[in-house]
Amino acid sequence: MSFIPDTTTLIQFAIATVILAITPGPDMTLFVSRTLSQGRATGFASMAGALCGTLIHTTLVVVGVSALIVASPMAFFVLKVFGAGYLVFLAWQALARGSAFSPEKKSGPQISLFRSWAAGLGVNLLNPKIILFFMTFLPQFVSAHDPNAPGKLFFLGVMFIVLSIPVTAPMVFAAEKFSTAMKASPRVTRVVDYLFAGVFSAFALKILTAQAK
């Protein structure tokens, strides 16, 4: 079919995708932290939201909206501020609610699956670095002169999502196993809360320093 790249391109793209999928980022930090604090279902909901954000970014690249955002200094700056601010909010949540699974807080507040999905969506959708990434990553595998380029770009974006699932899902299961051990140690639990808060804050700072190129 005309919208499917050749086999060599697909193999190269698959290898690159797997390598990128295991690279830590704000989205991975989110669904691992949500799994630790709220359980496996919440972790998968966050992961699903992040993948939906990836699909939206793919669509924006295909229709050219991402290029317009990067070309507009004001739009790019606003997106950076909102994206960084959202990660700071998640850092605060990690401290305020992160230890909700500890023995002393069994009746603590639970985050709904929809809110976890929305959090995952927000982490990817408000991250300008993802816009820059998809604008530079996907086009490497499609010729600019190919009349079927839009269809191939979208196909590769969907392929990126499909290949990411079996790579990232085991991390949720691993986090669930780790949370069982953490329940016996409130002190370790709190250390992990601060760890995730620090990681979210670091990613927020990284987003603020992103430059449109």
Where on the chain are the PLM-derived regions?
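Residue-level hotspots within the lipid-embedded alpha helices of multi-pass solute transporters
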Residues: V18-A21, N124-L125, I161-A169
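Alpha-helical transmembrane segments and their lipid-water interface positions
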Residues: G49, G53-V65, L87-L90, I131, ...
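Selective transmembrane alpha-helices of multi-pass membrane proteins
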Residues: A71-A100, V167-M171, S179-K213
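Flexible cytoplasmic inter-helical loops of multi-pass small-molecule transporters
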Residues: A96-L113
